Amino acid sequence: MAKKSKIVAQKKREKLVAQYAERRAELKAIMKCPTASLDERMEASRKLSRLPRDSSPVRLRNRDQVDGRPRGYVGKAGVSRARFREMAHRGELPGITKSSW
């Protein structure tokens, strides 16, 4: 089980990323635009750097939806590998069967 503070911080980051996603996309588009002047690009860069650090999607971490474990994340199921194994054994994941040959 991850620390509650880490899970809360992650939720806060997710809200910030969603809140600033459109603004960040606009500024990045200006920075990548070949027709924009150097001053416009520099101003967009300055504005982007003034946004909250946690509003960047790079700072998000994939976490287990059940207990927040940050390592061993299985993307399709949204849980950690340990939880994935438990759920598969109990038959809670449709279409997942234990291999046998």
Curated annotation (Swiss-Prot):
Q: Supply the Pfam families for this chain.
A: Ribosomal_S14
The protein's UniProt keywords, in alphabetical order, are: Ribonucleoprotein, Ribosomal protein, RNA-binding, rRNA-binding
Specify residue ranges for compositional bias: Basic and acidic residues. Answer: 61-70
Query: Family per UniProt?
Result: Belongs to the universal ribosomal protein uS14 family.
Assembly behavior: Part of the 30S ribosomal subunit. Contacts proteins S3 and S10.
Where does this protein come from, organism-wise?
Cutibacterium acnes (strain DSM 16379 / KPA171202) (Propionibacterium acnes)
**NCBIfam families this protein is in?**
PRK08881.1
Q: Name one GO molecular function term.
A: structural constituent of ribosome
Q: Name one GO cellular component term.
A: small ribosomal subunit
Q: What InterPro entries does this protein's entry cite? A: Ribosomal_uS14, Ribosomal_uS14_bac/plastid
Q: Which GO terms describe its biological process?
A: translation
Q: What does this protein do?
A: Binds 16S rRNA, required for the assembly of 30S particles and may also be responsible for determining the conformation of the 16S rRNA at the A site.
Protein name in UniProt: Small ribosomal subunit protein uS14
Disordered: annotated segments: 44-74
